[in-house]
Amino acid sequence: YLSNPMFYTAKEIIANGDLGEIISFRGIHAEDYMSDPRSPYTWRHEPVGGGVLADLGSHILATAEFLLGPIKEVMGESITVIKKRKTTNNKTKNIKIDDISRSFVRFKSGVSGSIEANWLATGCKMKHDFEIYGTKGAIRFSQERLNELYLFSLSDKKNIQGFRKIEAGPANKPYDRFCVAPGHQ
């Protein structure tokens, strides 16, 4: 995920001060590949796999720290919703790992935020999303629309304020090596 040129564009917008002082971060990585309780027990259900926090949460945590720097404090909860699953041999196994993990975080910079990892999110195929709010604007991103970053600026005239789409293209490195025009991916 960190190779996505739109992440670098977001980082540049933040570094340039276009959002003003950053006041909050919200991130989620949610998918639905574990949402059906009839789905069989897999290697992902083994405690050594770490559950949803290790499987999906690691990606949104890496994104958060890439954009805003190190996290210094965490308060969270992890829950197991589907407590038993059948194996491929039709035996029942107890689940001892988390299905959903939610955390409140504070970055070293003082910015606060929330992070969620959820593999029971019915309908979500690749919801690796973040929103960053500042005193002068905001950005938001969804991996399901990986070529797009949305920017809101308080400096826009009131009658045209709103999130505007930035599309990845040749101006967004390293897309310049293979992308001839915006909108191609």
Locations of regions flagged by a protein language model:
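Glycine/proline-rich active-site loop of Rossmann-fold NAD(P)-dependent oxidoreductases
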Residues: 95-97, 111, 124-128
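Short, mixed charged/polar active-site loops
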Residues: 112-114, 138
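A short, structured loop/turn motif at beta-sheet edges
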Residues: 19, 106-109
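C-terminal glycine/acidic-rich active-site capping loop/insertion
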Residues: 83-94, 102-107, 130-131, 136-185
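Glycine-rich phosphate/pyrophosphate-binding beta-alpha loops
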Residues: 58, 117-125, 184
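Flexible, active-site-proximal loop/turn residues at the rims of small-molecule/cofactor binding pockets
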Residues: 31, 80, 119-121, 145, ...
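Active-site rim elements
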Residues: 49-52, 118, 180-185
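Predominantly a Rossmann-like dinucleotide-binding segment in NAD(P)-dependent oxidoreductases
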Residues: 2-95, 149
